[in-house]
């Protein structure tokens, strides 16, 4: 297969999004068909690339001597590309009903397609320079998704999102400069890390930590997490879903590439970099859960939940062992499914009823049973209830913590994960219970069915079903992630 196929999932949606401003669709249906066709084609190309190719690579051009724009589809790239393109497709389908009365609908889709292409480039980047270039593009192009409503609150949130993104990117850029100088080249991703970097000076440790912190901004890691709860309540529900479920994972991918494919896990194991990383991750897990527990605005509660849940991933990565690494990658997938389901469910409720508070949702299970059943399944998955997929990832994370060899983390990690799971139950289960069991004094006669159309329901059902299926049969994913772990550890 021609290696130029790597450019298709990147250029197709970017070109389609840019051209969207030139097309005049007389009917919304034709606009939706256009957007869906592009997203479906991108997802299909990513799946075919993952299944039918080994590890194709493509060097486009040199920026400076020894610094190239280079793409390569290794196993990790394929996992992230398939995840992002498929979830992007489902969120796009969901948005057709959510935005059907929005005057800025076409502008939203143009930006949405462009961001999807930039994310594909991010996944397929073959070196740290290429990754960083598209990481910056992603931050800039995704900001209008937050800004979409053009209210005072959305403008403030968009500026905050961009400020935090740029600040994190500058921290990461410092690390890239140092590692590029020490490594003497383009910092191509190599499983296990680059030997040139591992033989470098002590300042390399600080550079690596700056990259963890910088890319961790996008993942919502403390202390640079504040953009998440600001951006989610003001963004349209489809944008909130992908910000939480997908764009945060771009930060996770940056950390994985920097630590496991450039620095090398062995290089930082047992150093202050690992210990501080573990501490920051556990603090964020607990803090995010506490803030979510106290929050009364539904989408903001889910945003704080993302701060906590993505830090489960960061915690697993910080332990630098196979079980924790597998658990972290599993949680990347499973959190994306659950959190997209939750945000889309919340968006459906807001769209149909106008209710935005966590204490306003009594009886919504009677009004919108399919939506709220999907919401409930996703909630149980995030809590970690078997046989849903969240249980599997958290099992591997706890196992990795016990095997970490870090005396405090060995017992403190599972304890904090358990406390966080209880807090997660505390802020999600009451919503589900009041939705289906509002109490004997509730006025059922005033309720009317407000279930959305299949365009909203199909993505919700698909992701909720996957949360069950992958929880019962996780073996295929576990084997794939174990192969990646064996290569980098």
Q: Which residue ranges define each predicted feature?
A:
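Alpha-helical transmembrane segments and their helix-start/interface "positive-inside/aromatic belt" motifs
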Residues: 28-39, 156-166, 368-373, 453-462
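Alpha-helical transmembrane segments
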Residues: 14, 35-43, 85-88, 113-117, ...
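Transmembrane helix-loop-helix hairpins at membrane boundaries of multipass inner-membrane proteins
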Residues: 1-8, 15-110, 186, 193, ...
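Short phosphate-coordinating micro-motif centered on Lys-Gly-acidic
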Residues: 136
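Cytoplasmic juxtamembrane regions at transmembrane-helix boundaries
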Residues: 97-111, 442-455
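Cytoplasmic/organellar membrane-interface segments at the starts of transmembrane helices
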Residues: 235, 366-371, 421, 428-489
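Hydrophobic transmembrane alpha-helices and their helix-loop junctions in integral membrane proteins
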Residues: 90-100, 106, 116-131, 141-434
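Hydrophobic alpha-helical membrane-insertion segments
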Residues: 35-48, 165-174, 375-383, 462-475
């Amino acid at each position: 297969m021609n290696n130029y196929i790597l450019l298709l999932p990147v250029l197709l949606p970017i070109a389609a999004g840019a051209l969207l401003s030139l097309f005049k669709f007389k009917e919304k249906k034709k606009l939706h068909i256009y957007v869906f066709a592009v997203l479906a084609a991108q997802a299909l190309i990513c799946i075919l690339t993952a299944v039918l190719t080994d590890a194709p690579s493509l060097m486009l051009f040199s920026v400076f001597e020894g610094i190239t724009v280079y793409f390569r589809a290794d196993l990790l790239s394929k996992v992230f590309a398939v995840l992002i393109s498929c979830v992007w497709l489902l969120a796009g389908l969901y948005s057709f009903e959510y935005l059907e009365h929005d005057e800025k609908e076409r502008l939203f889709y143009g930006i949405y397609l462009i961001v999807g292409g930039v994310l594909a480039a991010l996944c397929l980047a073959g070196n740290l320079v290429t990754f960083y270039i598209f990481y910056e593009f992603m931050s800039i192009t995704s900001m209008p998704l937050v800004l979409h409503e053009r209210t005072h609150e959305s403008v403030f949130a968009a500026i905050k999102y961009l400020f935090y993104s740029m600040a994190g990117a500058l921290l990461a850029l410092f690390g890239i400069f140092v590692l590029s100088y020490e490594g003497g080249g383009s910092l191509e991703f190599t499983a296990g890390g680059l030997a040139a970097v591992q033989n470098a000076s002590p300042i390399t440790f600080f550079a690596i930590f700056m990259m963890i912190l910088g890319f961790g901004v996008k993942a919502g890691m403390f202390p640079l997490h504040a953009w998440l709860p600001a951006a989610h309540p003001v963004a349209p529900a489809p944008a909130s879903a992908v910000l939480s479920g997908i764009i945060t994972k771009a930060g996770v991918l940056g950390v994985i590439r920097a630590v496991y494919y450039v620095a090398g896990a062995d290089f930082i194991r047992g150093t202050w970099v690992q210990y501080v990383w573990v501490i920051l991750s556990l603090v964020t897990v607990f803090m995010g859960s506490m803030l979510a527990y106290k929050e009364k605005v539904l989408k903001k509660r889910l945003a704080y939940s993302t701060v906590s849940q993505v830090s489960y991933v960061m915690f697993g990565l910080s332990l630098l062992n196979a079980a924790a690494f597998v658990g972290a990658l599993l949680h990347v997938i499973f959190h994306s499914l659950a959190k997209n389901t939750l945000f889309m469910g919340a968006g459906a409720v807001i769209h149909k009823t106008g209710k935005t508070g966590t204490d306003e949702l009594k009886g919504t299970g009677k009004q919108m049973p399919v939506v709220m059943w999907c919401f409930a399944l996703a909630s149980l998955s995030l809590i970690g209830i078997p046989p849903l997929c969240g249980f599997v990832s958290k099992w591997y994370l706890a196992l990795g913590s016990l095997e970490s060899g870090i005396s405090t983390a060995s017992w403190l990690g599972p304890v904090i994960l358990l406390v966080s799971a209880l807090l997660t139950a505390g802020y999600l289960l009451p919503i589900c219970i009041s939705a289906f069991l509002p109490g004997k004094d509730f006025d059922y006669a005033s309720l009317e069915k407000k279930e959305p159309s299949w365009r909203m329901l199909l993505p919700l059902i698909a992701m909720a079903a996957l949360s069950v299926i992958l929880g019962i049969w996780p073996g295929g994913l576990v084997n794939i992630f174990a192969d990646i772990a064996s290569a980098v550890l």
